[in-house]
């Protein structure tokens, strides 16, 4: 709130927006961003008696940048941009927002980034990522480490599935409790849409997700095991029924609003119908990398361990199944910038090794 202006962070058509309302005239306007897949949000604005608004802009191709915007003149001034060592040129990359259609007719926004001219070479290696829980929306963001993957010919894509709030509260409600499977179906349908549009093909398609996003990965490989060349599940929540039945585990009782209370038969049966651990069977599972942290208090280490053990028991393919246990890490992975880079490097090495086959 400013003396003469009211500024709102909004979401419109799936994009984060900054709306400015002149309190004297009632007129409003939105900041315009010349990008196809971006994120914008308000920075720290301590002064009320000013016409200067500070905000941050980032996208799949542009690092986080802080601007001052004059709400009277409409002029933006760049104050600071994250420095990228090594001569990064965003013009060499391209980002785009596509709209896929889910099996029930709902729209699935998909944000993609890749090196320019890559699309001229036909279907490429593509890593599809999603989260899709708790109403958390993964907006398009810049990643320094991701450049390593893009420079090796990968396309990176974010499927904005239900369970997030990409289109507001309705998107969240349609991806939780007894609607949870919509998150998984959206992800699969987004993947098939990208194949249809020839961004990739089955032999080049990889998927990734962590925590509740790891649940998504565990579910989609049960539903469509042969759709993926490889899958990465980081600290995955995969034994849904057992965990939600044990209130002694941290967060369990608080999570009933998200997944349901399995002490109620309707919720128990529904959870059992998608819980990755309970649905493991003799299938041609893709190549897999599963990671966990020994000190993880949110998804205890034994949950991914027992899942991998059961997968190995039912494993029928010649594909690889790796488990990486971080003995000094928690739910967020290794602390420290360089140790975190090692985790990313491991995931990328797994993906790249599969492209050599």
Model-derived features with residue positions:
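Conserved hydrophobic/aromatic pocket- or pore-lining residues that grip, position, or stack substrates
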Residues: 66, 100, 110, 128, ...
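Alpha-helix termination/capping residues and helix-transition junctions
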Residues: 12, 47, 60, 121, ...
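Non-catalytic accessory segments flanking enzyme active sites
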Residues: 1, 9, 15-21, 25-119, ...
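Active-site-proximal cap/loop segments of hydrolase catalytic domains
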Residues: 158-357
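Short substrate-entry loop that stabilizes the transition state in hydrolases
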Residues: 118-168, 300-301
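Flexible loop residues that form catalytic
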Residues: 11, 58, 132, 210, ...
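Short hydrophobic segments within beta-strands
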Residues: 9, 56, 113, 129-130, ...
């Amino acid at each position: 709130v400013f003396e003469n202006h009211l500024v709102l962070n909004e979401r419109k058509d799936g994009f984060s927006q900054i709306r400015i309302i002149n309190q004297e005239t009632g007129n409003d306007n939105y900041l315009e961003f010349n990008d196809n897949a971006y994120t914008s949000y308000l920075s720290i604005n301590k002064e009320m008696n000013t016409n200067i608004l500070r905000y941050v802009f980032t996208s799949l191709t542009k690092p986080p940048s802080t601007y001052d915007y004059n709400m009277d003149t409409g002029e933006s001034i760049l104050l600071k941009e994250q420095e990228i060592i090594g001569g990064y040129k965003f013009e060499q990359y391209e980002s785009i927002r596509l709209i896929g259609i889910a099996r029930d007719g709902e729209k699935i926004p998909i944000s993609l980034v890749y090196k320019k001219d890559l699309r001229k070479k036909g279907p490429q290696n593509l890593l599809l990522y999603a989260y899709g829980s708790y109403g958390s929306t993964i907006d398009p963001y810049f990643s320094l480490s991701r450049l390593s993957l893009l420079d090796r010919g990968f396309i990176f894509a974010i499927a904005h599935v239900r369970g997030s709030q990409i289109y507001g509260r309705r998107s969240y409600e349609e991806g939780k409790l007894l609607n949870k499977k919509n998150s998984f179906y959206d992800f699969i349908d987004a993947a098939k849409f990208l194949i249809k549009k020839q961004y990739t093909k089955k032999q080049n398609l990889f998927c990734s997700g962590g925590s509740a996003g790891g649940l998504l990965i565990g579910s989609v490989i049960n539903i469509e095991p042969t759709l993926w060349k490889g899958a990465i599940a980081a600290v995955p929540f995969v034994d849904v029924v057992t965990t939600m039945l044990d209130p002694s585990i941290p967060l369990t009782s608080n999570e009933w609003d998200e997944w349901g209370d399995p002490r109620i038969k309707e919720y128990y049966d529904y959870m059992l119908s998608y819980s990755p651990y309970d649905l493991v069977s003799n299938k041609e599972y893709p190549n897999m990398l599963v990671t966990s942290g020994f000190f993880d208090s949110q998804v205890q280490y034994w949950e991914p361990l027992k899942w991998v053990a059961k997968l190995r028991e039912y494993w029928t393919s010649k594909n690889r199944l790796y488990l990486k246990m971080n003995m000094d890490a928690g739910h967020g992975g290794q602390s420290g910038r360089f140790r975190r880079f090692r985790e990313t490097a491991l995931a990328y090495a797994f993906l790249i090794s599969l492209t050599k086959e």
